[in-house]
Regions:
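Helix-centered, glycine/charged polyanion-binding patches within enzymatic domains
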Residues: 70-159
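Tryptophan-centered motif/residue detector
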Residues: 6, 42-43, 135, 143, ...
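Charged phosphate-binding loop/patch that engages nucleotide di/tri-phosphates or the phosphate backbone
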Residues: 164-181
Length: 181
């Protein structure tokens, strides 16, 4: 699994409860937290005000779906969640262990390596370079951006914004299934 968040600007019709300002991404709006499988399809989704940090948003999303991890047998291999460098593993682990102490027996968090400027120059690349395996979550975020209703937050509530995000992925998965001969 791979996790990421995406800050999205609000339009004028968004309610005060759904507004927040993300200083890191300089965005006034909401954050979409997304955990996807290796195909880029959503496993868990959550929308929060943009002032909620990536760590807290991921913890909220996992706590809302904690029964998935509680029901997972110990005999199965650990689930690896690949995150970018915007997440702080020590904070994540301490918050999740307070909710479910056995979580580390079933889940393993891993930060994706950030390419240095020298490594980029060696490859002859500049600017944003997708990290190995992280391109899947970046592609999922791009799929959401292709849905016209998700380019900005047009919804009044966070529940409606989450429903729109889920609906976008349902449409995408149905299109994929219909394309199979």
């Amino acid at each position: 699994m791979m996790g990421d968040s995406q800050a999205v600007k609000n339009t004028c019709c968004a309610s005060a409860a759904s507004k927040g300002f993300c200083f890191y991404k300089v965005t006034n709006g909401i954050k979409r937290h997304l955990l996807v499988d290796i195909l880029g399809f959503p496993f868990f989704t959550l929308c929060t005000p943009a002032n909620v940090s990536d760590d807290v948003g991921l913890v909220m999303m996992l706590v809302m779906n904690i029964e998935y991890f509680q029901r997972k047998p110990m005999s199965e291999p650990k689930v690896t969640i690949l995150l970018d460098n915007g997440y702080h593993l020590d904070k994540l682990i301490s918050l999740l262990q307070a909710v479910y102490p056995n979580i580390l027996k079933k889940v393993r968090f891993e930060l994706s390596p950030k390419p240095s400027k020298q490594a980029k120059a060696k490859q002859g690349k500049k600017g944003f370079v997708p990290v190995k395996a992280r391109w899947v979550i970046e592609r999922s975020n791009a799929w959401m951006e292709r849905c016209k209703s998700l380019t900005k937050n047009y919804e009044r509530t966070l529940a409606n914004a989450k429903a729109k995000m889920d609906l976008c992925f349902v449409r995408l998965m149905i299109k994929r299934l219909a394309a199979v001969p």
